[in-house]
Amino acid sequence: MIKHLLSRGKLLLFVSVMATSSIIAGGNAYGSTAFTGVRDVPAQQIVNEMKVGWNLGNTMDAIGGETNWGNPMTTHAMINKIKEAGFNTLRLPVTWDGHMGAAPEYTIDQTWMKRVEEIANYAFDNDMYVIINLHHENEWLKPFYANEAQVKAQLTKVWTQIANNFKKYGDHLIFETMNEPRPVGASNEWTGGSYENREVVNRYNLTAVNAIRATGGNNATRYIMVPTLAASAMSTTINDLVIPNNDSKVIVSLHMYSPYFFAMDINGTSSWGSDYDKSSLDSEFDAVYNKFVKNGRAVVIGEMGSINKNNTAARVTHAEYYAKSAKARGLTPIWWDNGYSVAGKAETFGIFNRSNLTWDAPEVMKAFIKGIGGSSTTTPTTPTTPTTPTTPTTPTTPTTPTTPTTPQSAVEVTYAITNSWGSGASVNVTIKNNGTTPINGWTLKWTMPINQTITNMWSASFVASGTTLSVTNAGYNGTIAANGGTQSFGFNINYSGVLSKPTGFTVNGTECTVK
């Protein structure tokens, strides 16, 4: 795992999100999760809401330009497909080196900045989280005492510009201070580095966090990810990590291509799934959990995945188990996709074909989403009870409990409590139109339990009258397509006593089925 990572130096990522007051693309107004404010909630809640992620690798991190490493220009349609598959976080790799001026100001090229921002808004348009970092900056970001003064000065200038540009974005934008900072070319580059390297990385993390916080606004309380040396989960690197200012809104960033000989080494094993394999992976996650999560420090696995060795069955088993095991320990995994999927070659982490908007490894993707506890809207739901040829279908006699028995309810609502903590909870609501005509503009009403109060809502607006709540679509999600189209919104609540679901749901005055 460690040496192989050296060869993928070009494949790592920087995710950047920037602040705009209004950007329009494809007829949709950006901002569904862009300007939601920054909540004062535990970092673990944010990580839980991120659920599972996908890296737009080898694109904005490509040296020289967006398409220099063979991937097409990023489109809104690409990110739509990622969201439809079940991913809730976009990590967007960006290299700033080559797009900034000389010392002492290191002025970032605004055309580059705005392109990164445009792509990030594709994700916000899909109610996603976005991570922004510094990616391939190894030419100047060197973890040595001799380089420390110069690097700190440049880090401060660069992060100050990025943070100021993104100041108005809410807590669905997460900054990541660096990507895999390490002593490039050293014999211990991928094996923990030296004490000097680890200490200087801690100082760089502190410099970046302080620069971000100093810009004020939402950045004063924004959630920020910081890596260990090389983003390694080795005991040496995680034990020596120092959290800047012991900031409660700092999240640990790790990369875990585990196990290396299966996930990354083209000459390694192509099989995975034994009891030993699973217990070994569990042990790696346990070490991270016991060091950080157990002690109140949230963790995101910013990069992971497996390469294509003509071993789909093993990759499916690995992807599902990896996601399930990570989630059980409160870790959010983000798949590294570099757009390269040719079987039998090195670095073939690609699972999504950006040229034709299809999945190169659909089974792997579905297993990964399944493991995290989600489902892909790109996969039609199959009936659990097949119709037998001896029993003709009749409109008056439903034959299986999986078939809706209320044909008059053309709309169904899924009310899902996605997370709860103490006296608070997060809820996601999805409205599905099973009818044959689109819904153009919707108002969803329900009766709230008397012990619950909504504190904030995104992708919709609400009015409360007693215990009756009326929720109306935002400007960009008012149309729900016919024959299975969906729109979603979410909110947080405070509650006392038992956390129960509301009752009496109607959409535009008509009762609907509730799940």
Curated annotation (Swiss-Prot):
<dbReference type="Pfam" id="PF00553">
    <property type="entry name" value="CBM_2"/>
</dbReference>
<dbReference type="InterPro" id="IPR017853">
    <property type="entry name" value="Glycoside_hydrolase_SF"/>
</dbReference>
<comment type="function">
    <text>Has endoglucanase activity on carboxymethyl-cellulose (CMC), cellobiosidase activity on p-nitrophenyl-cellobioside (p-NPC), and partial hydrolytic activity on crystalline cellulose (Avicel).</text>
</comment>
<dbReference type="InterPro" id="IPR050386">
    <property type="entry name" value="Glycosyl_hydrolase_5"/>
</dbReference>
<keyword id="KW-0732">Signal</keyword>
<dbReference type="InterPro" id="IPR001547">
    <property type="entry name" value="Glyco_hydro_5"/>
</dbReference>
<feature type="active site" description="Proton donor">
    <location>
        <position position="180"/>
    </location>
</feature>
<dbReference type="Pfam" id="PF00150">
    <property type="entry name" value="Cellulase"/>
</dbReference>
<dbReference type="InterPro" id="IPR018087">
    <property type="entry name" value="Glyco_hydro_5_CS"/>
</dbReference>
<dbReference type="InterPro" id="IPR012291">
    <property type="entry name" value="CBM2_carb-bd_dom_sf"/>
</dbReference>
<feature type="region of interest" description="Catalytic">
    <location>
        <begin position="32"/>
        <end position="376"/>
    </location>
</feature>
<keyword id="KW-0119">Carbohydrate metabolism</keyword>
<dbReference type="InterPro" id="IPR008965">
    <property type="entry name" value="CBM2/CBM3_carb-bd_dom_sf"/>
</dbReference>
<feature type="signal peptide">
    <location>
        <begin position="1"/>
        <end position="31"/>
    </location>
</feature>
<protein>
    <recommendedName>
        <fullName>Endoglucanase D</fullName>
        <ecNumber>3.2.1.4</ecNumber>
    </recommendedName>
</protein>
<keyword id="KW-0378">Hydrolase</keyword>
<dbReference type="GO" id="GO:0009986">
    <property type="term" value="C:cell surface"/>
</dbReference>
<keyword id="KW-0624">Polysaccharide degradation</keyword>
<keyword id="KW-0326">Glycosidase</keyword>
<keyword id="KW-0136">Cellulose degradation</keyword>
<comment type="similarity">
    <text>Belongs to the glycosyl hydrolase 5 (cellulase A) family.</text>
</comment>
<dbReference type="GO" id="GO:0005576">
    <property type="term" value="C:extracellular region"/>
</dbReference>
<dbReference type="InterPro" id="IPR001919">
    <property type="entry name" value="CBD2"/>
</dbReference>
<dbReference type="GO" id="GO:0030245">
    <property type="term" value="P:cellulose catabolic process"/>
</dbReference>
<feature type="active site" description="Nucleophile">
    <location>
        <position position="303"/>
    </location>
</feature>
<dbReference type="GO" id="GO:0030247">
    <property type="term" value="F:polysaccharide binding"/>
</dbReference>
<feature type="region of interest" description="Disordered">
    <location>
        <begin position="372"/>
        <end position="407"/>
    </location>
</feature>
<dbReference type="GO" id="GO:0008810">
    <property type="term" value="F:cellulase activity"/>
</dbReference>
<feature type="domain" description="CBM2">
    <location>
        <begin position="404"/>
        <end position="515"/>
    </location>
</feature>
<dbReference type="GO" id="GO:0008422">
    <property type="term" value="F:beta-glucosidase activity"/>
</dbReference>
<feature type="compositionally biased region" description="Low complexity">
    <location>
        <begin position="377"/>
        <end position="407"/>
    </location>
</feature>
